Structures are given as C-alpha cells and as structure tokens.
Regions:
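Acidic donor-binding loop of glycosyltransferase active sites
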Residues: 88-103
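Donor-nucleotide binding loops and adjacent catalytic segments primarily
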Residues: 5-92, 127-129, 142-151
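Short hydrophobic beta-strand element within catalytic cores of glycosyltransferases
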Residues: 95, 111-123
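C-terminal "capping" alpha-helix adjacent to the active site of nucleotide-linked donor transferases
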Residues: 136, 140-143, 147-164
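C-terminal alpha-helical cap of glycosyltransferases
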Residues: 178-195
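A short, well-ordered alpha-helix in the C-terminal region of glycosyltransferases
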Residues: 164-178
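Acidic, glycine-centered active-site loop in nucleotide-sugar glycosyltransferases
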Residues: 109, 127-139
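Conserved donor-binding/catalytic loop of nucleotide-activated donor transferases
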Residues: 88-90, 106-113
Length: 195
C-alpha cells in the first residue's frame, strides 16, 4: 500500500476504505455521473480516487469537489505509470468489466463493483465477465437499468463492511488460484506451437 499512498499523497492513517473508480483512459460518463450523484455520501464513507478520463472530465466540477471534500476526493484524468501502486492501495475497485482490468484487479485481491458496457453497440463480453465474477462472489454488478445511484450506494454500503470485503477477497484467492491464468496462457501458447 505504501507506494500508492505516497503517490496519492494520502496519510497512512487514513481511516476510511479507499475506493478506486476507473472508467478507462477515455473515462465513462455513466460511472462519473453515478459517482457525482452520490458524492457526499461516498466521500463521508470512502476516500475516493477517481480516474475521470481524458474526455469526460470537467475541471470545474473536479475543482469544486476537491474544495468541498478535500483529501476524501482525488480526481485524475488518467493514472499513467503508477496504476499498479494505486490499485494496490485500493480497498474496493469500481470499474467497467473488461477482461484485462478485472483479472488484474482479481490477482491483486481487490473486491469489485462492476458496471459493464452493455447494449447494442457492444460485444457483450463485459456483461459476461461481470456476471462470471458475480457468480463467484467476487464482485457486485450493476447492469443496464440497475446501474443507478440507489443500487451503487447499496453496493458501496455492502463494501463498507470489512467482513464482506474479506469474504470477497477469500473468493478472489480461490478464483485466481484455481484458474492459474499464467499457466493457462502458457499451455495455450505451447499447444498452438506444437500444433
């Protein structure tokens, strides 16, 4: 946690769970809006590290929120080279459900709230990914109309309980340990080479 805490200029004695909000490099307007709709309650209960995206951010909105909530709200357009350290210090990660990002989060044993891209303009893989993690009790999932401010608050309330987060972490350990993704990838490559 140390490097991430120092990069984010957070006090090691921070007594609130750290919520890392990721919408991708371009951001996710839907996720940003859900955070803004619940911002007062969220900042009372979490320290929020918010990757707003390079496109969907508003410097005025961010400046006002930083002024209002101080160290409880830390916005970034994009977290570049230090993502691993920042992810390591998070207690909960709220993000889309792309395969790479959720498996990286799983390997680091971080409970997740997933808001997958869905609808006609997507392949549907994020919904499948999110539902898989939810079925393994490793994530809370908000899809379509269920991705609203009330359900987000309920999911975050669940994550405030140390026991709930700990149970999810145990399930993540089982999931990552059982699937051994690096071994599976290596086996697939070897099989492809050998024909």
């Amino acid at each position: 946690k140390g490097n991430g805490m120092s990069i984010l200029e957070l006090n090691e004695k921070n007594n609130k769970p750290i919520l890392l909000v990721l919408g991708g490099s371009l951001g996710a307007k839907q996720i940003n809006n859900l955070i803004y709709q619940n911002i007062e309650w969220i900042c009372q209960n979490f320290t929020v590290i918010h990757q707003t995206g390079l496109v969907n951010n508003s410097n005025d909105t961010e400046a006002n929120l930083v002024h209002t909530y101080g160290t409880s709200y830390k916005p970034f357009s994009f977290i570049h080279q230090n993502m691993q350290d920042v992810l390591s210090c998070a207690d909960v990660v709220l993000s889309r459900a792309g395969a790479n990002s959720i498996w990286e989060t799983a390997v680091l044993n971080k409970p997740m709230i997933l808001i997958p891209l869905c609808g006609a303009g997507t392949r549907g893989d994020q919904v499948d990914n999110a539902l898989y993690f939810e079925s393994k009790n490793c994530a809370k999932v908000l899809i379509g109309e269920n991705a609203n401010s009330i359900n987000l608050k309920d999911s975050l309330l669940y994550m405030l309980d140390d026991k709930n987060r700990s149970n999810m972490q145990e399930q993540l350990k089982l999931l990552v340990g059982q699937n051994m993704p690096a071994k599976t990838i290596a086996k697939t490559i070897i099989e492809g080479i050998e024909g």
